[in-house]
A protein has these predicted regions:
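Ordered hydrophobic segments in well-structured contexts
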Residues: 4-17, 103-108, 120-125, 160-162
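Acidic Ser/Thr/Pro-rich low-complexity disordered segments
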Residues: 21-25, 108-117, 163-169
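Structured, beta-strand-rich domain cores
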Residues: 64-119
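Mixed-charge, glycine-accented linear interaction segment located at domain edges/termini
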Residues: 123-183
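Solvent-exposed edge beta-strands and adjacent loop segments
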Residues: 2-80, 127-144
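Surface-exposed ligand/attachment interfaces on beta-rich extracellular proteins
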Residues: 47-51, 87-95, 179-183
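Membrane-insertive, pore-forming/entry segments and their flanking low-complexity regions
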Residues: 1, 6, 11-14, 171-183
Length: 183
């Protein structure tokens, strides 16, 4: 039987390129992850007759993931944008053009229990940026990039989304670990 615990905060978010079913590139850390929210997108319908609802249809058809981080990280932006990233000793430059293809990625997040004894990991194995990539630069405020992704079904191995609750503090990896621990 599952233990009921409370989870607080966001300890880690990672992103990796999606190379195929259950195949991912190297996991990259979203530095200063501030928010990761996941919403199920549900298709619904109902049959009505005799002044009542006779049947209800509901099916999860995708997931929406919103991410916000504390740093402007061009490497992370390059992974999701399909742009061209070049760097030298003086600068990093990410160029996005009309012919760039937005890539599928995998995203995973980690929250710790309020007593520090276990972890909750959330894994969206295949998603693509689906909303605006937001930057707000203004006087007296930090810039916090934010993006919205749409997750699709990857297949039988990982589905659309996984929630894995570990019985001990556990390092976040893509794909998700199957054992507890930080090493």
């Amino acid at each position: 039987m599952a233990t009921k615990t409370f989870h607080r905060g966001l300890r880690d978010v990672k992103i990796a390129s999606w190379n195929g079913v259950a195949s991912y590139g190297t996991a990259y850390d979203f530095y200063g992850a501030r928010n990761m929210s996941v919403s199920w997108v549900v298709e619904t319908d109902q049959a009505e007759g005799d002044d009542v609802v006779l049947d209800r249809y509901s099916k999860i058809i995708s997931v929406t993931v919103n991410i916000e981080q504390a740093a402007v990280d061009l490497e992370a932006l390059d992974m999701i944008s399909g742009g061209t990233l070049v760097s030298n000793g003086s600068y990093e430059d990410l160029k996005l053009g009309q012919d760039d293809t937005l890539a599928y990625v995998a995203i995973a997040g980690r929250s710790v229990s309020s007593d520090g004894g276990d972890d909750l990991h959330v894994f969206v194995p295949k998603c693509k940026i689906a909303g605006n990539l937001d930057f707000s630069m203004q006087y007296g405020q930090y810039t916090f990039p934010a993006a919205e992704f749409q997750g699709v079904n990857e297949g039988d191995v990982n589905g659309m989304i996984r929630f894995r609750k570990f019985t001990a503090v556990t390092a976040l990896e893509i794909p998700l670990r199957t054992t507890t621990g930080m090493s």
